[in-house]
Structure formats: C-alpha cells, structure tokens
A protein has these predicted regions:
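Short pre-active-site segment immediately N-terminal to redox-active cysteine/selenocysteine motifs
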Residues: 52, 60-64, 121
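A short beta-strand-turn-helix
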Residues: 37-55, 85
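N-proximal helix/coil linker or "cap" segments that precede and/or mark the start of modular domains
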Residues: 20-34
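Non-catalytic, surface beta->alpha helical segment in thiol-disulfide oxidoreductase systems
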Residues: 74, 112-174
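Conserved redox-active cysteine motifs that mediate thiol-disulfide chemistry
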Residues: 60-76
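Sec-dependent N-terminal signal peptides
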Residues: 4-13
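Sec/Tat signal peptide C-region and signal peptidase I cleavage site
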Residues: 15-19
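Thiol-based oxidoreductase modules, predominantly thioredoxin-like and allied folds used
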Residues: 35-38, 60, 74, 81-108
C-alpha cells in the first residue's frame, strides 16, 4: 500500500504573493509563461479548494532548462494537455529563471516550495492537495512527482495514476 505523506508546510499564506507584490521591475504583473498556469500558490490553493482538484506544480527553469522547454513544447503547449488539465488539476508554474529577475516574493515562494519538496533537478512536477490549519499554515498531501515524460498521453496517464492511487489509498484507509 502506497503511503501518502502529509506534511505541514510552515509557510504562512499571508507571507506569499499578493496582487501588488507580483509586479516586475517594469511595472507589469508577473505571469506564468503559458495560459492556464498560475504563479501564486495562494490563488492555486483557493482554486483547488473551490474545485476539489489537486495542484500540479511545475518546477522549471523556463529560460535555460532544455528538458523544461522540451516538456513545455511536447506536453504543456498541446491542446490535448490543456483540455485534460482544465478537467483534472490546478496548474502552478514555479520558475527559477537565470536571464530575468522574479518579484522577490515570488522568488521566495518558489524557493520555499522547492526546499519543501526537495527539488534537485528540472523539470520536476509535483501533484498535491493542500489545506490550511487553524494557524493559517498550509498542510500538503503529496500525491506524487514526475519529471520529463515524452508525449501528452504518457504524461497525463502518469498523473492520473498518481491521483487514482492516492484516492484508492484514502478509501482503503477509511475502510480499516
């Protein structure tokens, strides 16, 4: 039986991004590099809570990581993936660029989450559920992780499998 890890993330939601803080030096709002992706874990949490969908976080080096660019082109940019994602997950891009600066609070958020998930290479994709405790801290239930997988079907089948196993594990645990 697969264990589901439930860990308390000691980052208070209010310390993350607010709308005014996610601004680049040129005054533009910082956004993900693809439509449908969020950059603010708080907004992703709220959307996940509202829809009941897990969060899929893409730890990427958008401007330097060859495998990240390949995954984006071969999977994330395809309509088949976009349709699947809209039905199944909340997408979050956690970027670690080298050629441009992120807003400081986004940078802190991304590094905190990378440290929490022990990300050591890119791309790394984590699928997880989030909740908040009484103190305003996030609890994260990790469902699984993956990296570069060639093709939309192989990628989405892998993520679907993670989600299905986690749900089955919860059901099995509830029966005992």
């Amino acid at each position: 039986m697969r264990k589901i890890i439930i860990i308390t993330l000691a980052i208070i939601a209010s310390n993350f991004v607010s709308a005014q803080d996610g601004v680049l030096a040129n005054g533009e709002e910082y956004k993900a590099h693809a439509e449908g992706w969020m950059v603010d874990i708080n907004k992703a949490y709220e959307e996940s809570k509202k829809t009941g969908k897990p969060i899929m976080a893409n730890f990427t080096g958008s401007d330097w990581c060859g495998w990240c660019k390949k995954l984006k082109a071969e999977v994330f940019d395809k309509q088949e993936f976009k349709t699947w994602a809209e039905k199944n997950v909340i997408l979050v891009e956690l970027d670690f660029p080298r050629r441009f600066k992120l807003p400081e609070n986004i940078k802190q958020q991304n590094y905190s989450l990378a440290g929490f998930f022990k990300v050591t290479g890119y791309p790394t994709i984590w699928v997880f559920n989030m909740s908040k405790n009484e103190e305003g801290k996030f609890n994260i239930e990790a469902l699984g992780k993956t990296g570069y997988v060639k093709g939309v079907k192989a990628f989405t089948d892998g993520v679907d499998n993670m989600i299905t196993k986690a749900e089955a594990s919860k059901t099995d645990g509830a029966k005992k």
